[in-house]
């Protein structure tokens, strides 16, 4: 068997996405939580965190800095992906006096992305948000394109819109526990 090869640089650290709401970059970062914390030196912005409760628990030490900011952990299951959850995030943003110079970090899989992106897009007609996908599907599919939808009246993604993130941060450690194929 002959192996075909090509000159492909597999050491890419970013991909540009030309999305219709707005272009954005997907960055590949090891130790993403440390990267986020170091990037918070920009005093012209304020920060809010919306994180999957499982990720908050598994990475408790790495994410503890987030609790110094407005913070909400969430039980991310499909049955809770609804307008009430999005309004809970809007309440967090309102209580935080969030504005267009506030960055909402959404950390988790597709359920978190849908809820957080919807809240960010509709709160005060839109604030910037950054997505940190922690599932294989989140890292390979849902982080590209900006689709977001909430379930309503037993219908999946009935209430939907496009809301591209300002940035996507992918850390391969989140999928390192997957079984070998």
For each of these PLM feature ranges, what is it?
Residues 113:
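Catalytic nucleophile loop
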Residues 48, 103-104, 129, 167:
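Hydrophobic "anchor" residues on beta-strands that sit immediately upstream
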Residues 91, 95, 117-122:
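Short, well-ordered alpha-helices that flank and scaffold nucleotide-derived cofactor binding pockets
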Residues 2-103:
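ATP/NTP phosphate-donor binding region
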Residues 110:
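Acidic-aromatic/histidine active-site loop/patch
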């Amino acid at each position: 068997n002959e192996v075909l090869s090509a000159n492909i640089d597999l050491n890419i650290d970013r991909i540009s996405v030309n999305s219709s709401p707005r272009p954005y970059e997907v960055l590949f970062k090891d130790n993403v939580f440390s990267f986020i914390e170091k990037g918070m030196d920009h005093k012209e912005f304020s920060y809010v965190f919306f994180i999957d409760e499982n990720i908050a628990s598994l990475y408790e030490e790495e994410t503890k800095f987030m609790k110094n900011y407005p913070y909400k952990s969430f039980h991310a299951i499909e049955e809770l992906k609804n307008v009430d959850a999005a309004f809970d995030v809007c309440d967090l943003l309102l209580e935080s006096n969030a504005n267009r110079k506030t960055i909402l970090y959404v950390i988790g899989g597709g359920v978190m992305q849908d809820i957080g992106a919807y809240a960010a897009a509709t709160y005060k007609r839109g604030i910037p948000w950054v997505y940190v996908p922690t599932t294989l599907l989140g890292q390979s599919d849902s982080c590209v394109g900006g689709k977001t939808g909430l379930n309503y009246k037993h219908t999946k993604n009935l209430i939907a819109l496009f809301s591209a993130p300002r940035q996507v941060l992918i850390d391969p450690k989140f999928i390192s526990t997957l079984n070998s194929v």
